[in-house]
Amino acid sequence: MSIEVSNESGIDVSEAELISVARFVIAKMDVNPAAELSMVLLDTAAMADLHMRWMDLPGPTDVMSFPMDELEPGGRPDAPEPGPAMLGDIVLCPEFAADQAAAAGHSLGHELALLTIHGVLHLLGYDHGEPDEEKEMFALQDRLLEEWVADQVEAYHQDRQQERDRRLLDKSRYFDN
């Protein structure tokens, strides 16, 4: 799976965390592991321009998704297998997200993880234009975020245990001689 991140926002964010959450959601949603995703982080002025150009709405927004058409290969039945699908682009605005995070009482990292999940779900065809769609998408988004956080906590604890085990083994080597 190829996930490219381009941070043009001027705000320092954990690109590794964005890749981690995107990779987690793509795997959980059973997307082909060879899929490709592009993520761009913009400042509020650039996001406002993009928001006006594509959505005809003034001002910046937190996340925009631009799906590619390659997800549905179509074509002749005897055509060769298509290559890795390009899911599309997710555009995030960390400055806008920071304001939302402060209002919600959580970190920017948490907000960007949530928005990354939201963006991936849009690329996979989920929408929230209708009340039923919104309920389904936001419930899935919340569940995926909860599962990703639990996965991160488990990985952290495993890393700490491995470090403790390594130190214990190092100490025990002093007594072997």
UniProtKB/Swiss-Prot annotation:
Q: Does the keyword Nucleotidyltransferase apply?
A: no
> PROSITE patterns from the xrefs?
UPF0054
Task: Give the UniProt subcellular location, in the record's own words.
Answer: Cytoplasm
Instruction: Report any Pfam family annotated for this entry.
Output: YbeY
Q: Which UniProt keywords apply?
A: Cytoplasm, Endonuclease, Hydrolase, Metal-binding, Nuclease, Ribosome biogenesis, rRNA processing, Zinc
* Major location category of this protein: cytoplasm
What are the required cofactors? Zn(2+)
Q: Which GO terms describe its molecular function?
A: metalloendopeptidase activity; RNA endonuclease activity; zinc ion binding
Co-factor remark: Binds 1 zinc ion.
What does UniProt give as GO cellular component? cytoplasm
The record lists Zn(2+) as bound by: 118, 122, 128
UniProt EC number: 3.1.-.-
UniProt GO BP: rRNA processing
User: Any idea what job this protein has?
Assistant: Single strand-specific metallo-endoribonuclease involved in late-stage 70S ribosome quality control and in maturation of the 3' terminus of the 16S rRNA.
Q: Which family does it belong to?
A: Belongs to the endoribonuclease YbeY family.
Output this protein's name: Endoribonuclease YbeY
Annotated source species: Mycobacterium avium (strain 104)
The taxonomy runs: Bacteria, Bacillati, Actinomycetota, Actinomycetes, Mycobacteriales
